Regions:
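N-terminal ligand-binding lobe of clamshell/alpha-beta domains
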Residues: 1-297
Length: 297
């Protein structure tokens, strides 16, 4: 079976299911598993590299206002591959290519994509939703029994993480300029780690926050998980935000940065790993190599 993934989380779920070698093309943002990174990239972004967070936010807001997709699809490449299955998402126009974009790009009058090509759209907003997406993929490729085994191991891992409880209030920020609250599965991760979500409940959508909002949420600690960025970049974002937090609201609590791509941003079973990292960082009080780092102030 020939599979094209236009979504980093779909590529990760394919790897978790053991079908990474079925992938014939991946998205421009896919960075794991390493065994698929040689595949051609079937998507691109209209957002140029090198922009500040504020500039990225403004570009995204403008595109959303104008009804413009943030992503491009290489229809010529996909038509050449003639895939049996295309993996995408319907959760967030900002995060990745949506099914509507694919339909517009690949199902046009001059398009040669076979009618038999199946488009599977993932929409998980919680751990249970991510599980459902995983089984949606497993059903599409006929590997449900294997998926049951994988999910059993991951479910046990989640249960082990979720066994501890503290009263420590943590605010995770999915963006810092402007600050954005945690959404979808992230508050669920906070609670599973044994912490209290200072702002945002499981299933909530991320929203912009003022410094007054942050102060009113009374966090004991703040985590920087800017969507789409790794640890080093989030350390830089955290260092710049720390000065503002001190100057504007007198916050002197812990601030830690995380590898958002590997722990929080993508709806995959990596969110379970992310809950573990969160627990080790803010409950046990130590950094996780390559995953979390405290901001020195």
């Amino acid at each position: 079976m020939k599979v094209v993934s236009l979504l980093p989380s779909a590529t990760e779920l394919a790897g978790e299911l053991g079908i990474g070698d079925w992938l014939c093309a991946i998205s421009h943002e896919c960075d794991t598993p390493e065994t698929v990174l040689h595949q051609p990239r079937a998507t691109g972004s209209i957002i140029p590299s090198g922009l500040t967070q504020r500039e990225i936010n403004d570009k995204v807001a403008q595109a959303v206002r104008e009804g413009q997709s943030l992503y491009t699809v290489d229809g010529e490449l996909i038509n050449e591959i003639r895939p049996d299955l295309i993996l995408t998402q319907g959760l967030c126009d900002v995060c990745a290519v949506t099914e509507a974009t694919i339909e517009a790009s690949l199902r046009g009058v001059s398009c040669s994509l076979p009618r038999e090509t199946t488009i599977v759209s993932f929409n998980g907003e919680s751990l249970n939703g991510i599980r459902d997406d995983f089984f949606l993929l497993a059903n599409a490729v006929g590997l449900v029994d294997h998926a049951e085994q994988v999910w059993g191991r991951r479910r046990a891992q989640w249960a082990q993480v979720a066994g501890r409880k503290t009263s420590k209030r943590v605010l995770l920020l999915e963006w810092v300029d402007p600050p954005y609250s945690p959404g979808h599965w992230v508050p669920e991760q906070i609670e599973a780690a044994g912490l209290v979500s200072a702002y945002g409940a499981p299933g909530d959508h991320s929203r912009p926050l003022s410094m007054d909002d942050i102060e009113r949420s009374r966090p004991d600690a703040i985590g920087i998980i800017c969507c789409g960025f790794g640890l080093d970049a989030n350390v830089q974002f955290g260092q710049s935000l720390a000065d503002r937090l001190t100057a504007e609201i007198g916050f002197h609590g812990e601030i830690a940065a995380f590898d958002a791509n590997r722990c929080f941003s993508r709806p995959t079973f990596a969110v379970i790993d992310g809950a573990e990292v969160l627990q080790k960082t803010f409950v046990e009080g130590h950094e996780v190599d390559g995953m979390s780092r405290f901001i020195q102030r």
